[in-house]
Amino acid sequence: MIEVKNIAKKFGDKTVLKDVNLEIKDGSVFGLVGTNGAGKSTLLRLLTGIYEADEGEIKYDGEPVFDNEKVKEGIVIVPDELYFLPNSNLKRMAKFYESYYKSFRRKRFDALVETFRFDKEKTLSKLSKGMKRQAAMILALSVRPKYLLFDETFDGLDPMVRQAFKQIIIKDVEDNNTTVIFTSHSLRELEGVCDTLAFINNDTVVFSGDIISIQNSMFKIQVAFKEEFDKDTFEGMEILGFEKNGSVANMIVKGDREEIEQKIKAMNPVLFDVVMLNLEEIFNYQVGASGYSFDMSLLEEE
């Protein structure tokens, strides 16, 4: 299990992360979602022990990760900005991985190369972005680590390759109890893969939890009453969005779904309907509620 407690990180005077707390269970597929520049990549580098936290601690099965080679042997990361040895090909990189990771499986590597029809002899620096990412993922998956971390996971991969890698990763989780962490600014990439999510905004985790709980904690309600009403009618409820057209209002509500349904039904509405939100909608409303938005009025013509 990975425990992240009260983590903070600065670069100079700039605060990148503050008061970050997470618990990632073994065998889970954990998605770390946030806008560009939210701190996802920094947190991933803290999780791998590349960076040292200014405050707080990160532990793997009770052991600190920073400056701990024993823990790091069980962690493999595919970063957003890929790095390969100068003038290397996949064949040479496999030897390098094999020399560092005791768990590197040559048979697994050969099978992945054959599956994706990857030319091991081609110089990696001359390949496209998508092919470089394929190479990095083949190497990472050949290690069969206990902890597998991906930054902007499927960026540059075509749809068929992306789906194939997803299937391989999910099978590793099922067969080997691998713990996987994905970061992305696109929830569509992670939906259907992750069982747990954390949303980062304004340098910290806004909320986290298993996907079912998250989807049940925020929803859209369509409601109407005989009498006149406005947002204040629903005092005591956390309303993230309220729009009224005529006598019908559409609201985005955060909280215990069953409890909120009971409260509104007790108000005797003439129309009442609950609509589930997808994860991308939840993320957009949550981030908007915490102050991230664009002032589109600046683009209006004078």
Which residues does each PLM region occupy?
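Conserved ABC transporter NBD signature motif
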Residues: 56-71
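ABC-family P-loop ATPase nucleotide-binding domains
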Residues: 79-135
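Conserved structural motif at the start of ABC-family nucleotide-binding domains
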Residues: 2-4, 17, 72
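Helix-to-loop junction immediately C-terminal to a conserved catalytic motif
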Residues: 48
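The feature captures the beta-strand-to-loop junction immediately N-terminal to the Walker
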Residues: 30-35
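C-terminal coupling/interaction segments
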Residues: 252-302
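ABC transporter nucleotide-binding domain
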Residues: 165-255
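Catalytic Walker B motif of ABC-type/P-loop ATPase nucleotide-binding domains
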Residues: 148-152
